[in-house]
């Protein structure tokens, strides 16, 4: 595979600029030097340089004919299995990885929390991973409050071992990777309707608005994180998630103006 497509993330410049998805084609073509190719390949969740649409997924939503009847077809297969008994009454929270919980780089970092070996085209590369401040307490508490699902546009060969080391408490009931995204207008989008959960009881935490463009009313936005060890975003979000964990319908809260918005 092209070594420029394994990790999906955005740069600091892109985070400060107009809202774009991670790996947006225009920014990738005009701003990213070739040295970032491997990084873009591993983490990049949003764009495919060839512009090729993803193949149809078995979890695609049912099509509805003009008269409202559902055409006969194979029963839909959702991305998630049925919720476990302990999670049956909990809201499902989809949580992003790169620039939300961690930041990764192929450039050596002295204070890396994890070093992940990733094979690309027969060559093993070391990926240096920094944990966002307060991520441990955040995941521990989120796992108690919600049915948590890791959903990243990065490839599993990178994201799976990162999640193994990051999630000490088994907060993530499931992990979804790039192949579970929908390719839409140059971005990898996380289509929440394919999860198999009531959308009134689904949240998504992601630093990229392009990732939840299909369901913006389900989103709890989070600022992109790179290396600021004084960051308190995850800690500051916990009281809001505590509130959301007690509602019957997330729209009753998320469709209301939030302080500072």
Swiss-Prot record:
Main location: nucleus
Pfam families: NIF
pH dependence: Optimum pH is 5.
EC annotation from Swiss-Prot or TrEMBL: 3.1.3.16
Regulation: Stimulated by GTF2F1. Inhibited by beryllofluoride anions.
Outcome, altering residue 98 to N: Completely abolishes phosphatase activity
Cofactor(s) the record lists: Mg(2+)
Annotated InterPro entries: Dullard_phosphatase (IPR011948), FCP1_dom (IPR004274), HAD-like_sf (IPR036412), HAD_sf (IPR023214), RNA_Pol_CTD_Phosphatase (IPR040078), TIM50 (IPR050365)
Keywords for the protein's UniProt record, in alphabetical order: Acetylation, Hydrolase, Magnesium, Metal-binding, Nucleus, Protein phosphatase
Sequence ranges of Polar residues compositional bias: 1-10
Reaction catalysis annotation: O-phospho-L-seryl-[protein] + H2O = L-seryl-[protein] + phosphate; O-phospho-L-threonyl-[protein] + H2O = L-threonyl-[protein] + phosphate
Cofactor note (record): Binds 1 Mg(2+) ion per monomer.
Region (Disordered): 1-33
Residue(s) carrying N-acetylmethionine: 1
Active site: 96, 98
Domain FCP1 homology: 86-244
Any single GO CC term annotated in Swiss-Prot or TrEMBL for this entry: nucleus
Domain of life of the source: Eukaryota
NCBIfam families reported in the protein's UniProt record: HIF-SF_euk
Quaternary structure and partners: Monomer. Interacts with GTF2F1. Interacts with REST.
Function: Preferentially catalyzes the dephosphorylation of 'Ser-5' within the tandem 7 residue repeats in the C-terminal domain (CTD) of the largest RNA polymerase II subunit POLR2A. Negatively regulates RNA polymerase II transcription, possibly by controlling the transition from initiation/capping to processive transcript elongation. Recruited by REST to neuronal genes that contain RE-1 elements, leading to neuronal gene silencing in non-neuronal cells.
The protein's name: Carboxy-terminal domain RNA polymerase II polypeptide A small phosphatase 1
Species of provenance: Homo sapiens (Human)
Taxonomic lineage from the root: Eukaryota, Metazoa, Chordata, Craniata, Vertebrata
């Amino acid at each position: 595979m092209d070594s420029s497509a394994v990790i999906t993330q955005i740069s600091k410049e892109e985070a400060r600029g107009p809202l774009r998805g991670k790996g947006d084609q225009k920014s990738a073509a005009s701003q990213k030097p070739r040295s970032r190719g491997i990084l873009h390949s591993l983490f990049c969740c949003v764009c495919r340089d060839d512009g090729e649409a993803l193949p149809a997924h078995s979890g695609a939503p049912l099509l509805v004919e003009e008269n409202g009847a559902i055409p006969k077809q194979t029963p839909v297969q959702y991305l998630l299995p049925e919720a476990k008994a302990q999670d049956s009454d909990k809201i499902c929270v989809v949580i992003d990885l790169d620039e939300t919980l961690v930041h990764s780089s192929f450039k050596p970092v002295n204070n890396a929390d994890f070093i992940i070996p990733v094979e690309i085209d027969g060559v093993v590369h070391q990926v240096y991973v920094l944990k966002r401040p307060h991520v441990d307490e955040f995941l521990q508490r989120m796992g108690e409050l919600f049915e948590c699902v890791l959903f990243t546009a990065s490839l599993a060969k990178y994201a799976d071992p990162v999640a193994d080391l990051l999630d000490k408490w088994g907060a993530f009931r499931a992990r979804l990777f790039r192949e579970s995204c929908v390719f839409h207008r140059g971005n990898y989008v996380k289509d929440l309707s394919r999860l198999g959960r009531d959308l009134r009881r689904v949240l998504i935490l992601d630093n990229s608005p392009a990732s939840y463009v299909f369901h913006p009313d389900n989103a709890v936005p989070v600022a992109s994180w790179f290396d600021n060890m004084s960051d308190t975003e995850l800690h500051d979000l916990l009281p809001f998630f505590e509130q959301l964990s007690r509602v019957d319908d997330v729209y009753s809260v998320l469709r209301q103006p939030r302080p500072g918005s």
